[in-house]
Amino acid sequence: MPALKPTEFMGRVVWLGVNQDRAAALESTSRDVLSLPFGGPPEESHSGVTRRSCSRVSRQYPKGTEIANTRQVSIVSEEDLALIAQDMGLARIEPEWLGVSMVVAGIPDFSLIPPSSRLQDDASGTTLVVDMENRPCHLVSAVIERGYPGIGKRFKPAARNRRGVTAWVERPGEIALGATLRLHIPDQPVWPHLATARNG
């Protein structure tokens, strides 16, 4: 029995990019096509089948532990970027500032899509698996602050539940600008004890 449900929610790819040297800078550089082998975009600083654990999994592993890399790609929505900019009092938030790999348009509340959802290119079948919601961080605030002094600190509250998701490659291939990604979601109910677990 299939465990994933194709939906009619479609995302159009409106921006692609890579961050080639995370140690040097957070910002990403735009691309027309993203090559996606199993390890993620080869040029991307977050690529690889494994990675070193970071703050997002600090309660599970000591920092620097080698773990499977479920953070190969960072995806945000055009709609969420517009809302972040609006709340910050800016005309626009550029995807480069966030160091993202991809911007999609057309999927509402994109940052809250369920973990383990798939984003599948309708034409090529290239598929990304959503790991989890991304979290706003002070590093983006610092990038914005350089261009807009006094504004950078507004990023974290404005980007709460709008920072997009992290994902990894399940079926390799390429995704190009203008591609259409269909959202597939896990066909299971919400765990009844979720609120208790979160508050415990």
Segments predicted by a language model, with ranges:
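Acidic/glycine-rich phosphate/pyrophosphate-binding loops and surrounding catalytic core
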Residues: G147, R154-F155, A167, T180-I185, ...
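Glycine-rich active-site loops that engage anionic ligands at enzyme catalytic sites
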Residues: V104-P108, L112-R171
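Short, Lys/Arg- and Gly-enriched loop/turn segments at beta-strand edges
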Residues: V129, H138-V140, D187-G200
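Short, well-ordered loop/turn sites that connect or cap secondary structure elements
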Residues: I113, E174-L177, L181-L183
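Short, surface-exposed secondary-structure boundary micro-motifs
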Residues: S124, E133, T180, P186-D187
